[in-house]
Amino acid sequence: MSTDRYVSPLSERYASKEMQYIITPDMKFRTWRKLWIALAETEKELGLNITQEQIDELKAHAEDINYDVARERERQVRHDVMSHVYAYGVQCPKAKGIIHLGATSCYVGDNTDIIVMTEALKLVRKKLVNVIAELSAFADKYKEQPTLAFTHFQPAQPTTVGKRATLWTQEFLLDLEDLEYVLGTMKLLGSKGTTGTQASFLELFDGDQETIDKIDPMIAKKMGFKECYPVSGQTYSRKVDTRVANILAGIAASAHKMSNDIRLLQHLKEVEEPFEKSQIGSSAMAYKRNPMRSERIASLSRYVMVDALNPAITSATQWFERTLDDSANKRLSIPEGFLAIDGILDLCLNVVDGLVVYPKVIEKHMMAELPFMATENIMMDAVKAGGDRQELHERIRELSMEAGKTVKVEGKDNNLLELIAADPAFNLSLEDLQKSMDPKKYIGRAKEQTERFVNEVVRPILNSHKELLGVKAEINV
């Protein structure tokens, strides 16, 4: 840990080493060299005077980057791409004359950005699939556990703990669907020159249009992509960055919603996130068990959601074929968005894997409210016993108000059942009334909906991503 210079908390505290490496300079510069090799191979295969010996020399030094030479050169020329062209040429004297031939800086810069974002999205997908797997297992485990539902954070018709978890799961599934679409449509910039017209290649290939048309598809294939964007200015459209950032923001929104619910449930003592034996909740209040993981999910999620504005504004404000006011913003917003969402997903995995449910507390809260919710059934039973529906409705309203006063003003337990049993209009005993107090009578189809969702919606998706399953997350602090 550095103490004499600023280090982003996203890398020091929150993101995994795997995600951190994807956005490192080392990943970037190694990808530059792969792109230069792909370009040289393509040009050789299409007839330019490039030898196999030159290609082999480039491949021999694809990984052992002479960073010291590149740094010293950049101090002199103030241009990162040309500094690395020079450094590569120092290692490859036979090939130095054909490195970066016909290309502009964006050939390596923008294609690398696409490759890096693609790799980062793959890691996001992997972790997202595992969050969905953990959540669906939790939902299935607690599909029959009745619990109070809340609308406006006021007690409402009961649901189950598992059914509530399906709501969180479904939001992450929508994110996965969006992510898969964007991943499936990622394309490279290709090599189109300074303004996207491929003018330099017209010169190199003596105006042979048919040959030039083969350049981008060949580069894409060599770099593991299906195709390149058909048209561009100097850069790929910054709309691509916007789409990627929106995917991250969507996942962040889903995580934030889940974390909020967990925080509220922890306040009610119905559900708790994992709490380690040596963990300290408060420096002053030693008894505290704060939901700090869920709070951190919410905190980082807000950052990612707001960060999505950066690529959108950058895309909107680009001039003509390109302006450089995208560069500094991209260097911050895209990598940090990925670091933050990586930390969020690790936290989600950790929290969901260790969620603790307290059925007795849930039952206590349920039974405090269930008499109110059972009044319609009670009224129907009383009508069947000979009562008048309208009169009974009015009596239930009056008795409910009286019971509510007992709970809120006097701080006593809900005595609605006792009040109804004592009212001759209902002709029902307390024993009869208590028979209607089984919470499972009031959860509707929550269990069946959960089973169907897990079996028919989630499991087929997990089965199609089996190779991604099995991730366990560790959090640093």
Annotate each language-model stretch with its function.
Residues 1-199, 207-220, 281-282, 292-296, ...:
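A helix-coil-helix interface module used to build multimeric assemblies
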Residues 20-24, 69-71, 279-299, 321-336, ...:
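Short beta-alpha connecting loops at secondary-structure transitions
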Residues 39-42, 124, 128-131, 135-138, ...:
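Amphipathic alpha-helices that form helix-helix packing interfaces
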Residues 140-162, 272-288, 321-328, 353-373:
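Glycine-rich cofactor-pocket loops
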Residues 163, 242-250, 377-385:
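Short, well-ordered beta-strand elements within core beta-sheets of diverse protein domains
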Residues 175, 226, 233-327, 331-332:
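Glycine-rich anion/phosphate-binding loop at the beta-strand->alpha-helix junction
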Residues 272, 395-402:
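Active/binding-pocket-proximal capping segment
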Residues 303-389, 395:
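Long, amphipathic alpha-helical stalk/connector segments used for oligomerization, subunit docking
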